[in-house]
Every structure is written in C-alpha cells, then in structure tokens.
C-alpha cells in the first residue's frame, strides 16, 4: 500500500545553529563578498539604479573656405616641388563649389578632385539611341581643401527621460589617435567649449582619424587618397553616467577611417537646355555622422532588480555551505541528522484520553 504521507511529504526550513568556525567563517566570507558585489559594485559603481537608454539626435553642418589660400601645394602642376603621384591642375573653389550635396542631414562631403565633362546631345532624347558626347574634359584638384573649416551643430534627445540638449550647451571632447580625450579652444579649432559651436579644420579632422590625403589610396596605391577620396565615420557619443551627477552630460567625438573604400558622387548641371550639361564627378572626403551614447535616469525598478539578483547569490552560498557540512566534513553524519528530521505518520492515529486526563494519539487501541 502506498504511503501517501511519505510521497507527498512537505519539506520545510529548519534553522540549525551549527557551532563550527569553519562553516561560519566560510559563510561570512560569502556574505561579505555577495553584499559587496551587489551593493558596492552592481548598485553603486555600475550604477544599477539607472534606467539606460540610447539618445537620438540631429546634425547640421556648414563648410567655410579659408580667408586666404595657401597657394603652394606640391600636387598642383604649376608647383615645382616634387610629388610622388601625378600632378593635376588646381582650382581654388570657395565653400559653395567645394560642398556637394548641400543640406545633407546625416553626412558631409568636401570635394578633393573633380572630373569636369562638357557634354552635349546633338539629338532628341526621345530617341533611345541618343547619347551624350563629351567635348571638353578636365581633371582638377581642389587646392588647399585641408584649410577649409567645418561647423558641426548637433542636438541630442533621450525619449524616455526627455533629456534634451544642444551641443553648444554641453562640455565635449575629441579622441586623438592615442585614445585620449582632449578639448580644443584655439583660434580656429573649437571642440567642447560651452557656449561655442564646434568648429574643426579639415586638416585637424583628418589628423584625429590618422589620415593624410597624400598617403596612398585605400584601393589603389598608385593614387593618393586626395585623388580617390575616402569615407570617415564621425561618432558623437553622449553620456551622463561618467559621474554620479546625472545633470552633467558630456559628448565625445571619435573619428574612424573606413577601410578599403573610396568616395565619389556625380553632379549634373543643365546649361542652355537638357541637351547641354556639365557633368561633375566629385571625389571627396565623406563624413558620416553617427550619434549614440548612454543616458541614464534613476529608476526604482532597476535598483530593485539589482538588489534582488543578490538574493539568488545568497541562496547559492548557503547551499554550498550546507553541502560542505553534510557531505564533506568529518562531522557530516551528525550535521545531517540535525539538519534533516522526519516526523512520524499521523495517518491512522486515534485520540485517546489516558488515566491522567491527557490526550494521546495511537496507531491502534492495542497500544494502550
């Protein structure tokens, strides 16, 4: 016959105070380590009380030409200085001619070389065999593009916490080639100064990316980067978790060159009519802005989850000490008998009043 009392027995917790310094010290060490990890490391150092979100943002850029061009570039044909690559004619375009496309809200393009083709279609474009023919072709460098300056106006917004700031209201930095955060407040280059917009010379921007336009192209070593163009990622990372004051927000620029890429973009200018056009093939420095970061705000549920996670560790530590006591120590049998106790079954017992007037439970009446 099945003993359902044994099968469906209920296990309850029994507190046994084992006077053994080995177990006590081990359990105390576990407790201190777990509390230190949960409270000091997870909750305080790692800021487990914060709800973290990634901000979104917008970018506006402007290109400014220098007040005075250098006029002594070794890559220009009219310069006698040696240059390790083919020299081209140079043109001194202002910012309106050097920038294309205009109004790009996610990137920025500064031309370094332009192929200019004067094309005409001496036929009707309604004819499927009609093609444009090139009558004049020129290939030129945009001289002294490194002296142009870029204004970067950026704004960040964290939807959940509704934190919003313009870059001009924040402190900021830019990472140099060694990964150091530096702040610029020079006559031309300004980065991270509150109340001032961020402005960088293209030469400085390339320097932070470790790029020289006269280095070999990333896809054809017989040409310089100036000839083929390049693509740079400009990361703007916002954070208010670098200190314990959540009202302090900073941003950091990091500029990375995209390997094995060149950049060019076509531009068509219609002249007298659609049959007459100038075709520009621009090779350029392409900047792609990526706004990211970590914005934190106090959240009680996050704090509660951080603290509750420690309860599981406490349970594991108690289990380890218990198993050590009942399975490995020399006194394991004694400790096991103290920890585990099985009651007798009350299934078929009857209540009897004895001669002293006390209630007694017996399995059968013959036990009297």
Swiss-Prot record:
GO terms for biological process: calcium ion transmembrane transport; cellular hypotonic response; regulation of calcium-mediated signaling. The keyword Metal-binding does not apply. Disruption phenotype: Null cells are still capable of osmoregulation and do not show any noticeable differences in their sensitivity to hypotonic conditions. Quintuple p2xA/p2xB/p2xC/p2xD/p2xE null cells displayed slight delay in their osmoregulatory response, but are still capable of regulating their cell volume in water. Extracellular purinergic response to ATP persists in the quintuple null cells and p2xC single null strains with no alteration in the kinetics of the response, but the magnitude of the response is lower. Residues 282-295 are annotated as: Pore-forming motif. Residues 1-24 are cytoplasmic. GO terms for molecular function: ATP-gated ion channel activity; intracellularly ATP-gated calcium channel activity. One of its GO terms (cellular component) is contractile vacuolar membrane. Residues 46-368 are lumenal. Keywords: Ion channel, Ion transport, Ligand-gated ion channel, Membrane, Receptor, Transmembrane, Transmembrane helix, Transport, Vacuole. The chain crosses the membrane at residues 25-45. The keyword Membrane applies. It is found in: Contractile vacuole membrane. Belongs to the P2X receptor family. P2X receptors are ligand-gated ion channels that play a role in intracellular calcium signaling. ATP does not evoke inward currents in p2xC. Not essential for osmoregulation. This is P2X receptor C. It comes from Dictyostelium discoideum (Social amoeba). The lineage of its organism: Eukaryota, Amoebozoa, Evosea, Eumycetozoa, Dictyostelia. The gene is p2xC.
């Amino acid at each position: 016959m099945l003993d359902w009392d044994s099968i469906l027995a209920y296990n309850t917790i029994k507190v046994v105070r084992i006077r053994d310094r080995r177990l006590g010290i081990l359990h105390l060490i576990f407790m201190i380590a777990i509390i230190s990890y949960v409270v000091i490391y997870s909750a305080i150092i790692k800021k487990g009380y914060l709800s973290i979100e990634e901000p979104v943002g917008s970018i506006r850029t402007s290109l400014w030409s220098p007040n005075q061009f250098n006029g002594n570039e070794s890559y220009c044909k009219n310069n006698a200085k040696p240059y390790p690559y083919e020299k081209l004619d140079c043109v001194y375009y202002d910012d309106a001619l050097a920038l294309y496309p205009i109004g790009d809200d996610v990137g920025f393009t500064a031309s370094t070389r332009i192929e200019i083709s004067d094309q005409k279609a001496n036929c009707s474009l309604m004819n499927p065999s009609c093609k444009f023919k090139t009558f004049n072709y020129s290939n030129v460098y945009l001289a002294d593009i490194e002296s142009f300056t870029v204004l970067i106006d950026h704004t960040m917004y964290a939807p959940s916490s509704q934190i919003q700031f313009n870059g001009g209201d924040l402190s900021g930095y830019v990472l140099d080639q060694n990964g150091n955060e530096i702040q610029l407040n020079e006559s031309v280059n300004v980065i991270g100064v509150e109340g001032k917009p961020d402005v960088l010379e293209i030469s400085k921007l390339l320097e932070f990316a470790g790029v020289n336009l006269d280095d070999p192209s990333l896809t054809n070593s017989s040409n310089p980067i100036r000839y083929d163009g390049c693509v740079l990622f400009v990361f703007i990372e916002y954070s208010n978790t670098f200190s314990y004051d959540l009202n302090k927000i900073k941003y950091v620029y990091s500029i990375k060159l995209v390997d094995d890429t060149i950049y060019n973009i076509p531009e068509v200018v219609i002249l007298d009519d659609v049959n007459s056009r100038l075709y520009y093939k621009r090779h350029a420095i392409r900047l792609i802005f990526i706004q990211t970061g970590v914005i934190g705000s106090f959240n009680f549920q996050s704090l509660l989850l951080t603290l509750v996670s420690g309860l599981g560790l406490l349970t594991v530590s108690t289990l380890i000490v218990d198993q050590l006591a009942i399975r490995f120590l020399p006194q394991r049998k004694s400790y096991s008998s103290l920890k585990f106790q099985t009651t007798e079954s009350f299934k078929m017992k009857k209540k009897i009043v004895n001669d002293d007037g006390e209630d007694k439970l017996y399995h059968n009446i013959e036990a009297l």
